[in-house]
Amino acid sequence: MTSDQNDKPYDVVVRYAGLDDLDRLAPLFDAYRVFYEQPSDPAVARAFLAERLRLRESVLLLAEVDGAACGFIQLYPYFSSIAATRTWSLMDLYVAESARGAGVARLLMAKAAEHARATGASQLELSTAHGNSRAQALYESLGYELDTVYRYYSLAL
């Protein structure tokens, strides 16, 4: 695939993924976890995605080039009590190395925003590693703004 980063890559399709896509999604999800310094474990990747899809706890968007899976986004729904609206958390975004720089991430992000709007959400939130400057540049180029009002905490259980 050869395409300028700002051009729409040819033959890229972004669609909703289902349980029948697990064999294509699981290797991408495993590679995503490895990127974030988790050990490769295809069985864990497949089981995690299967449970999310089976229980309808997330929405997965799959990008394909000429029928081959090359990226995904996973969205989780939640609600903003303050705004009294639905919100979506863009928790996972991954594009295979062979498809990077061709606009696949932009297409996935656009489809995620389209999904959020279609479900009446007031916003689409995401987080990324402090050192992931490439992703940060993408998000900022799409109009995402760094939250300077709230500080987020977590508790390991």
Give names to the regions the model predicted.
Residues V95, G101-E114, A137, S141:
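Conserved acetyl-CoA-binding loop-helix of GNAT-fold acetyltransferases
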Residues R106, H130-V149:
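Conserved active-site alpha-helix within GNAT-family acetyltransferase domains
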Residues P27-S40:
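Helix-loop element at the rim of GNAT/NAT acetyltransferase active sites that forms part
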Residues V13-P27:
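A short beta-loop-alpha structural element at the N-terminal edge
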Residues L62, A68-P77:
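Conserved beta-strand in the GNAT
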Residues S40-L60:
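Active-site rim helix/loop that mediates acceptor-substrate recognition in acyltransferases
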Residues R100, S122-A135, S154-L157:
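Conserved beta-strand-loop-alpha-helix junction that forms the acyl-donor binding cleft
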